Structures are given as C-alpha cells and as structure tokens.
C-alpha cells in the first residue's frame, strides 16, 4: 500500500555552487554520499532532489528533518536507493513505511526525483 509520494525539481548549478562549501556538504550529505559526489559532482543535485522528495513524502519537508539523515546511494547497477537515519528513520517507522522507491531524471540544468513510500 502506498503511504506517500514526493517529487522535487532542482537546478543543478545551484547545488554545484553550494557544494563548494564544506559546511553544505557536511550538513546535507553522509560520508558515503560525499565520496560519490567527489567522483561525480552531478550526483549532488540528484541526491539533493531525492532528499527533498523523501522529506515531502514523509509529510514534513525539512522543518523537522536533517538532510544528511536521508542517505541516497546507488546499487551496483546504478539504481538509487535510500537509507534513513535519525528523525527521518523514526518518522518512516511511525508511518509504517517498509520500502521507498526512487526515480531520478536529469538534464544538464535540472535534476528531478520522484519517490513512493510503501507499507
């Protein structure tokens, strides 16, 4: 059963510029995500769009969540997946979310993410 959906569209250039600051990287991305971003800066916008979409799916936005508590990684085939920690993990557990499905699309200028929470 679907528990929630979230979508986000973000400008790649804005995220790339923000990533020039270590404080932004540390606040928004886990160590594993930072490794991914160092290898491919475009992943920063993709991941941030997923984080925004997950926060919307949970129904709070970032008012009560920390972006780094939503970790976005890729499996060996490149499929994105999400790990939740802290308040994001607790909220998902309270809502009975057992799986989060993620889709990312991007162009040179924009990254888009769509997520579905499922019981």
Language-model features, listed with the residues they occupy:
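Core catalytic alpha/beta fold that binds nucleotide/phospho-ligands
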Residues: 1-119
């Amino acid at each position: 059963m679907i528990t929630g959906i979230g979508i986000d569209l973000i400008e790649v250039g804005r995220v790339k510029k923000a990533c020039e600051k270590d404080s932004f990287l540390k606040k928004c991305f886990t160590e594993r995500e930072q490794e991914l971003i160092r290898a491919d800066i475009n992943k920063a916008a993709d991941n941030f769009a997923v984080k925004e979409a997950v926060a919307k799916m949970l129904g709070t936005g970032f008012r009560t969540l920390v972006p780094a508590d939503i970790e976005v990684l890729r499996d060996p085939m490149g499929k994105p997946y999400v790990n939740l920690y802290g308040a994001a993990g607790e909220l998902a557990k309270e809502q009975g979310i057992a799986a989060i499905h993620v889709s990312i699309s991007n162009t040179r200028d924009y990254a888009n993410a769509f997520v579905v929470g499922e019981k």
